[in-house]
Amino acid sequence: MYAKLNEFEEKVIRGITEDRWLKLATELIKTGQPRACDPLDPDLPSGEEEAIAMLVAGKLEALGMEVNMYESQPHRPNIVGILKGSGSGPVLMMNDHMDTYPVVEPHKWDKTNFKPFKATRAGDLLYARGSSDTRGNLACTILAAQALVENGIKLKGDLMYCFCVDEERDGTHGSIYLTKEIGIKADYSITAEPTAYGGDATKGDWGMNLSIANGGHCLIEVTLEGDKAHIWRPDTSNNAIVELAKLISHLEIMPFTHEITEFMGHTPPCTTIVRIRGGLPGEMQFSPDSCTVTLAVVGIVPGMTLESIILDIENEVKSFIGERKDITYKVNQVKDCLL
C-alpha cells in the first residue's frame, strides 16, 4: 500500500507528464551523438559529452539553478547545478551520467529504422541508444526539478544535480574526479541508473528495482603461450587458442575468495568473458603460440582486492595447467582499467 500523497507531492506529480517526458527524452537522446558514446574498451578512444552537457546546463540554468562545469579532460565537462533550499536541511543529490554505450552494429537497430539515436516509440516502450541508460532517466530528473520550480516549492535543503561524464568507462573523469578532486558531496544521493538487478524480465521491468549499494568490476587479461607449428603438423604444437578455449570453461565457473557482506546483491563475484584474441595477421600457415582472453570480473564486494582477484585467477590457471611444462601463462589487470 502506498502512502497518501500530500498537497505538494500531488502538484509535483501532476507536472511530470508522459508527453513532457517523451519530448525531453527524445531531445536528450539524440544530442551530441555519436560523440558521447564511451566504450569500456581501454584500447578505444573515450567519448566527448560536451554537446549534451551544454544542453542540460542550459536547462538547469533556466530553472534558476546555480550551474558550474568541471572537467579534467577537454570537451568532457561535468555539470553541477544547485537549486537552493529554504533553510538548513540536508543536501539531496540527483545523479546521472551523460555518456552512453557505443553503437557498433547500427544495421541491427530495426526498431528505430536503423537509426540508433532516433527515439522511436512502440507501445509503452521507447527504443534508442540511451533511452534507458540513461538519457530517458536524465529527462525524469530534470522534469522533477521543473515541477518543483513551477509550483513554487522549495526544499529545506539544497537540491544538487550532478550530471557526470565517463560513467561507462569507470568514472575517472566523472564521479571520481568530482568527489576526490573537486570535493562534491551531499547528505543523500539518488542515482538514476537502470541496472538494478531483480526485476522480472518477462514483464519488461528488469532494471526497475531500487538498489542501495553497488558492486565493483575490473578487467583482467589471461594469456596462454604454447608452441607454434605449421598448420599441417598440429600434432607437433600446443595450439594456444585450443588450450585457452579449454581453460575458459573453468574461468567461467571459478569461485572468488570473499566474505559475505551486508548487501551482496544478486550477482556474486564471478567472471564474464568479453574478448578473445589469438593468431597474428599473415601467419595463418601456423598454429598460434599465444592467445589472450579478457575477463570482466563483476560483483566485487568490500574486502576483495586486485591482488586477491589475480591470485584466485592464477590458482585456477595453475590447476588447469597442472604439471605441463609446454604451456606458460600470464595474468594481469587491463591497463587503465580501475578496480
Label the model's feature ranges.
Residues M1-D19, E48-A51, A62, G199-G204, ...:
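Metal-dependent amide/peptide-bond hydrolase catalytic core
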Residues Y2-E105, S290-A296:
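N-terminal helical capping/dimerization or prosegment-like subdomains
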Residues P34, D99, E168, T195, ...:
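Catalytic metal-binding/acid-base residues of hydrolase active sites
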Residues G64-Y70, K118-A119, K330-N332:
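Short secondary-structure junctions
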Residues N68, M93, M160-C162, K330:
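A structural signal for isolated positions on well-ordered beta-strands in alpha/beta enzyme cores
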Residues G89-M160:
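Active-site metal-coordination/substrate-binding segment of hydrolases
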Residues P90-M94, C162, Y188-I190, T272-V274, ...:
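Hydrophobic/aromatic beta-strand patches that form the interior of the parallel beta-sheet core
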Residues S132-I253, E262, S287:
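Fold-level recognition of mixed alpha/beta catalytic cores in primary-metabolism enzymes, strongest
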